[in-house]
Amino acid sequence: MSKPNNSTAPLPFPILIGDIGGTNARFSILTDAYAEPKQFPNVRTADFATIDEAIQQGVLDKTAVQPRSAILAVAGPINDDEIPLTNCDWVVRPKTMIEGLGMEDVLVVNDFEAQALAIAALSDENRERIGDATRDMIASRVVLGPGTGLGVGGLVHAQHSWIPVPGEGGHVDLGPRSKRDYDIFPHIETIEGRVSAEQILCGRGLVNLYHAICVVDGIEPTMKDPADITSHALAGSDKAAVETVSLFATYLGRVAGDLAMVFMARGGVYLSGGISQKIIPALKKPEFRIAFEDKAPHTALLRTIPTYVVTHPLAALAGLSSYARMPANFGVSTEGRRWRR
């Protein structure tokens, strides 16, 4: 019978690598520590009743390689051996997976732990620098990603090891500072009476901010889709959309600067996800870095910390693969998150 196991021993190859999102699940198989991962087509979560069916039909039925173990990144709390996902109906059941899919070992980690693992050694071709700070230090880092929500993960460098730190940093407070902020914030939709960063810095938050700007300016909002708002903003074809994305970049800079100080992220702050990639032109305007650096009495420190947008199309899978190849380089906690036959 499979059971929880806190072993830090390497996962046995071949290893199934999975990044499970709300809409899509991405999989690859790593046959050994020196091989390139074998990628599989994205799986739409809505097309399968369970993750086990998705793995069987989307991966195992398409290859002769039988994984002995799996490492999965999921959006959701990992508290026991039934792990409900935040943004889709799947439930990850490692014991069932071991019995039904013929595996020996399953490790489940937080989705932004995987993103944090990825930024340990991201090449220049997989990141876009924002601002003038260029110092590339082997030092602690932080990644934040506006998407369905606002994910945050730290990557602490200590004793020659990279230690990913998951958390709920997307729910820190975000408050007004400028006169325009004080006009807009009363119209931001709150959660239980407060404005957290995630109420603005995600897809639905972008719409929330746009609607608040429209209310303040006395105009009728015409857009309900974040993609429409960003497209009109980048094209300069809608005044409210332009201001929405400009303020989004400002607020993202404020939160990113706060997190840089929390983690003393001299190794850099990384922005991940589709929204960050799409609004790179807006992030390269002065507002993001001005807000990022405006942290008196530590402005001089923030000016030295580089900021990047992650452009790797499969960053989470790359991070998990790095860990699977060389687990000794990372301080990944397995307590309560690893099951073995």
From Swiss-Prot:
This protein's record includes keyword ATP-binding: yes
GO CC aspect terms: cytosol
Family statement: Belongs to the bacterial glucokinase family.
Binding site for ATP: 18-23
Catalytic activity of the protein: D-glucose + ATP = D-glucose 6-phosphate + ADP + H(+)
Intracellular or extracellular location(s): Cytoplasm
GO process terms (BP): glycolytic process
Gene3D superfamilies per record: 3.30.420.40, 3.40.367.20
Name of the featured protein: Glucokinase
Pfam families recorded: Glucokinase
Superkingdom assignment: Bacteria
EC number(s) on file: 2.7.1.2
SUPFAM superfamilies listed in its UniProt record: Actin-like ATPase domain
Key word Transferase present: yes
InterPro entries (UniProt xref): ATPase_NBD (IPR043129), Bacterial_glucokinase (IPR050201), Glucokinase (IPR003836)
